[in-house]
């Protein structure tokens, strides 16, 4: 196969340049397809209302819901992180993906029905209705925005930068800024519907490219049996450092783990202990899949509850594939390129990938640039760009929703739809600017622990949120005081672990971290279990010692009362009163509310084009504002969780089938 290589003077300095017509044509065709879908959604969907922009008008059927859930979850961090951890330690990291098969069913069957009957757009808004007060909603909004910027965006930016460096040799800043610009354009212009349609397209691009590369990789290594025959012998030949403080490196630092072929590992000595993987990971996954804005927003856009459940099942089936499309190819990359992917000498690793702690993160990009022929190499670049753009676009849109609905409306409670839409789009621009400013930090933090980084940060900050959401949905006795102080207490515990670990660093086998054992010895997933239990006990204890919330405020806000027909007195009703309506306080009201008419001269042609581009043209609807009866009918439709019994049985049987498949695979690779 033809390769375009610039030979460097040292190991790791080779640059494969995608400068041939076949690769360029594939990349151009992909971008034209994505832009075309985004423009189509601009014409097709209603972006002139808050509900239309943020919830896709509640019109999505099951297959784009499921594809969007999967595409929003699978970013370039998964390609780089899962393959890298697979190269470093074997199959166990796939447990992060297969655990989601069960948790995503909890989302569709237990959590989403309550979110729908509550009539909310954002998760902090649900807690506002459930508990009253402002401090929980504000706390969760700020925490979510913090996690978006410093974990999700940073991971995607880092992993995208790794791939671009390996595949293109372009300037990192120019490449990533261009990607962010394109992502921002179709996020700002298209709203959630554009994201969900482009997510669907990109899901197929991601899977097609990953399947092709997996086929090449298995062919190169000698098939499935060749992988398991050769992986334990995949060791670097360079094991002596010129640094006197390092010298001869212990074989335990460069030999593959003896338990590399097992998902469930020793509870004490394992790098992913099985109790932590089964329990601690479920807690962190529960936060991500059941209360994270990026994921839940996709479900809330579903046509009805049956379509949402079917979408969750489709997402679950898709989550079976990363083991075979990412983890195993990462292991194959170590077999094929042990001196690069499995490097252990600090100065060698520095030359190969720019960091001294290890280069396992280049496992997947290395396969692409070494194995793929012209055209297909361009396809894989398009796959990685699709993953990066999909994940970033999801974060931009969802963080825009959070900021607009949960923070800005506290500052401007009487803001109309037009102002809220404008602020939401400006927030996307601000997030892009922060992302670009964060690039030097991400580049300086290139280490061998990408997937551990995101999971550990989540384990230190997410369990209190998981505990509060679980208790909020299933324990009516929990009140605002208990929930708030449970969150605060959990945050303090998490920071007590997070700050020392990042101050001392995670270290490596060659140069272990100096972090005191009292703070850093406990595995981060074990710590997640401890943090979840402590936060839950604190929340329950304070709730039981203080006054309960009367049941009249809880109808359709807790799981046991999701079918209640009683009229609910919302604890946030004070925000709905006043001379001017607040369009963001009811999940259905804003979905039917058109932008307020402004008596002003007709805008010129240029301004009309700009307003249409941003989804703010008043001529798009072609109909008068809805009547009070129409608003009420729309609200009832959005909060309806009734299902056709026949289709409900179909999705229930499919859920059982998916769980059976998942249990078999867990047992087979245990």
From Swiss-Prot:
It is found in: Apical cell membrane. Forms a heterodimer (via TM13) with PDZK1IP1 (via N-terminal transmembrane helix); this interaction enhances SLC5A2 transporter activity. Keywords: Cell membrane, Disulfide bond, Glycoprotein, Ion transport, Membrane, Metal-binding, Sodium, Sodium transport, Sugar transport, Symport, Transmembrane, Transmembrane helix, Transport. Disruption phenotype: Mutant mice develop glucosuria associated with increased food and fluid intake. Belongs to the sodium:solute symporter (SSF) (TC 2.A.21) family. Residues 43-61, 113-134, 294-307, 405-422, 476-480, 546-649 are cytoplasmic. Glycans are attached at residue 248. GO terms for cellular component: apical plasma membrane. Residues 1-20, 84-91, 165-171, 216-273, 330-373, 445-449, 504-521, 669-670 are extracellular. Enhanced by the interaction with PDZK1IP1/MAP17. It comes from Mus musculus (Mouse). Disulfide bonds join 253-509, 343-349, 353-359, 515-520. The chain crosses the membrane at residues 21-42, 62-83, 92-112, 135-164, 172-193, 194-215, 274-293, 308-329, 374-404, 423-444, 450-475, 481-503, 522-545, 650-668. GO terms for biological process: D-glucose import across plasma membrane; renal D-glucose absorption; sodium ion import across plasma membrane. It catalyses: D-glucose(out) + Na(+)(out) = D-glucose(in) + Na(+)(in). Expressed in epithelial cells of early proximal tubules (at protein level). InterPro entries: Na/Glc_symporter_sf (IPR038377), Na/solute_symporter (IPR001734), Na/solute_symporter_CS (IPR018212). GO terms for molecular function: alpha-glucoside transmembrane transporter activity; D-glucose:sodium symporter activity; metal ion binding. Electrogenic Na(+)-coupled sugar symporter that actively transports D-glucose at the plasma membrane, with a Na(+) to sugar coupling ratio of 1:1. Transporter activity is driven by a transmembrane Na(+) electrochemical gradient set by the Na(+)/K(+) pump. Unlike SLC5A1/SGLT1, requires the auxiliary protein PDZK1IP1/MAP17 for full transporter activity. Has a primary role in D-glucose reabsorption from glomerular filtrate across the brush border of the early proximal tubules of the kidney. It is a multi-pass membrane protein. This is Sodium/glucose cotransporter 2. Na(+) binds at residues 71, 74, 387, 390-391. PANTHER family: SODIUM_GLUCOSE COTRANSPORTER 2, SOLUTE CARRIER FAMILY 5.
């Amino acid at each position: 196969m033809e390769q375009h290589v610039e030979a460097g003077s040292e190991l790791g300095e080779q640059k494969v340049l995608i400068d041939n017509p076949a690769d360029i044509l594939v990349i151009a065709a992909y971008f034209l397809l994505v832009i075309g879908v985004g423009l189509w959604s601009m014409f097709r969907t209603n972006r002139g209302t808050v509900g239309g922009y943020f919830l896709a008008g509640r019109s999505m059927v099951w297959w784009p819901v499921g594809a969007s859930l999967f595409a929003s979850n699978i970013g370039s961090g998964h390609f780089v992180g899962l393959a890298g951890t697979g190269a470093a330690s074997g199959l166990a990291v796939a447990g992060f993906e297969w655990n989601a098969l069960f948790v995503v069913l909890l989302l569709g069957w237990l959590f989403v029905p309550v979110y729908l009957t509550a009539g909310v757009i954002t998760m902090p808004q649900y807690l506002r209705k459930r508990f009253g007060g402002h401090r929980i909603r504000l706390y969760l909004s700020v925490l979510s925005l913090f996690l978006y910027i410093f974990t999700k965006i940073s991971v995607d930016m880092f992993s995208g930068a790794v791939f671009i460096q390996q595949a293109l040799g372009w300037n990192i800043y120019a490449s990533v800024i261009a990607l962010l610009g394109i992502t921002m354009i179709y996020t700002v212009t298209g709203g959630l519907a554009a994201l969900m349609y482009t997510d669907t397209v990109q899901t197929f691009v991601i899977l097609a490219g990953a399947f092709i590369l997996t086929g090449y990789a298995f062919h190169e290594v000698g098939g499935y049996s060749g992988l398991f025959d050769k992986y334990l012998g995949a060791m670097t030949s360079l094991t002596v450092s010129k640094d006197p403080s390092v010298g001869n490196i212990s074989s335990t630092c460069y030999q593959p783990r003896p338990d590399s072929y097992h998902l469930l590992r020793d509870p004490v000595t394992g790098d992913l202990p099985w109790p932590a993987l089964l329990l601690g990971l479920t807690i962190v996954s529960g936060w991500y899949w059941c209360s994270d804005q990026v994921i839940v927003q996709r479900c809330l856009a579903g046509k009805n509850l049956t379509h949402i459940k079917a979408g969750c099942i489709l997402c679950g089936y898709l989550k079976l594939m990363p083991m075979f499309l990412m983890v195993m190819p990462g292991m194959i990359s170590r077999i094929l390129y042990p001196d690069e992917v499995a490097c252990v000498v600090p100065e060698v690793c520095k030359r190969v990938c720019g960091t001294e702690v290890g280069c396992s993160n280049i496992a997947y990009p290395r396969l692409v640039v070494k194995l793929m022929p012209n055209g297909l190499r361009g396809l894989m670049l398009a796959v990685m760009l699709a993953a990066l753009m999909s994940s970033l676009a999801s974060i931009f849109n969802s963080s825009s929703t959070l900021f607009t609905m949960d923070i800005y409306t506290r500052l401007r409670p009487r803001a109309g739809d037009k102002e809220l839409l404008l602020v939401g789009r400006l927030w996307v621009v601000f997030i892009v600017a922060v992302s670009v400013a964060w690039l030097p930090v991400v580049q300086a933090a290139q280490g061998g622990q990408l997937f551990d980084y995101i999971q550990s940060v989540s384990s230190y900050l997410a369990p209190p949120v998981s505990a509060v959401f679980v208790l909020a949905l299933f324990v009516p006795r929990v009140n605002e005081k208990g929930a708030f102080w449970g969150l605060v207490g959990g945050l303090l515990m998490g920071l007590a672990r997070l700050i020392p670990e990042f101050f001392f660093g995670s270290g490596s086998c060659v140069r272990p971290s100096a972090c005191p054992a009292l703070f850093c010895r406990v595995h981060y997933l074990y710590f997640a279990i401890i943090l979840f239990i402590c936060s839950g006990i604190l929340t329950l204890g304070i709730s039981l010692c203080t006054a309960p919330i009367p049941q009249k405020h809880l109808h359709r806000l807790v799981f046991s009362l999701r079918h209640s027909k009683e009229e609910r007195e919302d604890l946030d009703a004070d925000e709905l009163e006043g001379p001017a309506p607040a369009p963001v306080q009811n999940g259905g009201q804003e979905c039917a509310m058109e932008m307020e008419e402004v008596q002003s001269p007709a805008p010129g042609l240029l301004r009309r084009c700009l307003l249409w581009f941003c989804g703010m043209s008043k001529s798009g609807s072609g109909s008068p504002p809805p009547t009070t009866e129409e608003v009420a009918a729309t609200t009832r439709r959005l909060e309806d969780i009734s299902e056709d019994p026949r289709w409900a049985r179909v999705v229930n049987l499919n859920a059982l089938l998916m769980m059976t498949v998942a249990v078999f695979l867990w047992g087979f690779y245990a």
